[in-house]
Amino acid sequence: MLAKRTISSLVIIVVGIAFVIAGGWVFALGITLVIALAASEYSRMFAQGGYYPSFPVLIAGSSLTTLFAANPESELLLLAFSLSVLTAIAYHVFQFSKHQDTGGMDLAATLSGLVFIGFLGSYLARLRFLPLGHFWIILAVAPAGISDI
């Protein structure tokens, strides 16, 4: 088990450093893929617990928020995040009759996923576009990656 985790960690480190060095839209698309996978895992985790967070809204909202974070115009990031939140609220209002027992928790899980994965994760994309961004992104991500081994 430890050998398998070490090999997967090495692959992730190599691919991650390649994305960081490439920079630009290659990095933005790579980090968007990572954020989408994180949102998918988050949604499945709640689904196993008997809750129903909105899988499509979490994936699309987190991905769009991260993609628009790569743009220097911060208004697009806020627009994408705001539309994601409004879409999540509308989705759960319409789905409330199907899941009345867990409706509030479903909405809370979706909104917290959008905030903690989508909005805060989008700052990884913004961090790379700072001067010396490759240094800052490696400095920010390396301790978390190393501690996960």
Predicted features by range, described:
Residues 2-149:
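Membrane-embedded alpha-helical bundles of polytopic integral membrane proteins
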